[in-house]
Amino acid sequence: MAIITLTSDLGTKDSYLASVKGSIYSQLETTKVIDITNEISPFNIQQAAYVVRNCFKDFPHGTIHIISVDDELSLKNEHLAVKAEGHYFIGSDNGLFSLLLSEMKAERIVRLNISQTTNCMTFATKNIFVPAACHLARGGTMEIIGTEVADFEIQKTELKAVITKDMIRGAVIYVDSYGNAITNISKEVFENAKKGRNLSILFGREDEQITAISTKYKEVPPSEKLAIFGENRLLQIAINQGKANKLLGLKLHEIIRIEFK
């Protein structure tokens, strides 16, 4: 059974998401539709890319991932289907794929040329992405639904941590539903820079400070702050049984410094 995942900013309040799912099942009753999340902040491609990048490998090869964020077609916002690491990704060329493909290699990219069966041009997810996904789920080939893109250029749109001799300077790139502030500082970068030295993790306007890396959230008492590497091997600032983003004022793009002595 083919699997199609949905990641979108459609929300669950309106009928849009139900229309997308109904369209999938109308075209291919035997598929399985799984929501990754439909609560992406409106037009936030960074958030969508982060979420998909962190979980797509948990799905079997051949899974088709529809990513519906800023999906309206324009000259600067074309629609693509990408095969990478054995998975298919369908979405808009609005910077999303530069973020997705920054750490993986695309096997094939096509520019979708599916003809709509409706005059409505504002719901590409339903009218273009869904037919493309169902075609692939049936075992169809990519050249049937699009023209080959041979010169796709990855735009460096994602912030990278800056490493110096005695410091790593990173930033918050995502805040999860628990209020954990996830940074762009990887465990590999951290371990290469630490070299057995003591550390201070500094953030916030009053230079909040953490001096150790925890391995579990409950290593500190409730309501205490901590730093921990999550399953995705990225450093996060958290509060045991609390919301770090609110209590520590950590927002997207907030600077996080790790100083070594």
Protein language model annotation of sequence segments:
Residues 15, 19, 28, 43, ...:
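Conserved active-site and cofactor/substrate-binding residues in soluble primary-metabolism enzymes
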